[in-house]
Amino acid sequence: MMYKAADFVGMLFLARDVAHSVHLNTRSYSKHIALGIFYDRIIGAADDFAETYQGRHGLMGPITLHSATKTANIIDFLQGQLDDIEKCRYEVVDKSDSSLQQLIDNIIEIYLRTLYKLRFLA
């Protein structure tokens, strides 16, 4: 799939929605906390990316709102999104645009820290 900035931000909005849903339905306290931190941070990171992108390129247009497919396993869901982010990052933003690429690095860091907590601390 060819990603544009609006698709990328929409993917992050979906991650927030899925993580929040699992956060509210888990019986694991550590999973509850890890996902709470994720959904709080990912929406701020999405906002930072969107505003910075629009500062450089102008308005990106309507955000693509994705719907979740079956998300029985939050680790698989987040890992799949992380894989997509790492594959599409240079389609979304030119590799030479270090300011926007750094914001994508920050987004990747949020995913990796959450995956660590879910895999090894939950």
What label would you give each PLM region?
Residues 14-36, 91-97:
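Helix-loop segments that flank and shape redox-cofactor active sites
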Residues 22-25, 29, 39-42, 63-67, ...:
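Aromatic-enriched hydrophobic runs in primary sequence
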Residues 65-119:
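Acidic/histidine-rich alpha-helical segments that form the ligand environment
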Residues 2-10, 29-36, 68-72, 98, ...:
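Short, solvent-exposed segments of well-ordered alpha helices
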Residues 1, 121-122:
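Short intrinsically disordered terminal tails
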Residues 32-61:
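Conserved alpha-helical segments that form or flank metal/cofactor-binding pockets of metalloenzymes
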Residues 6, 10-13, 17, 36, ...:
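Generic structural signal for well-ordered, non-transmembrane alpha-helical segments
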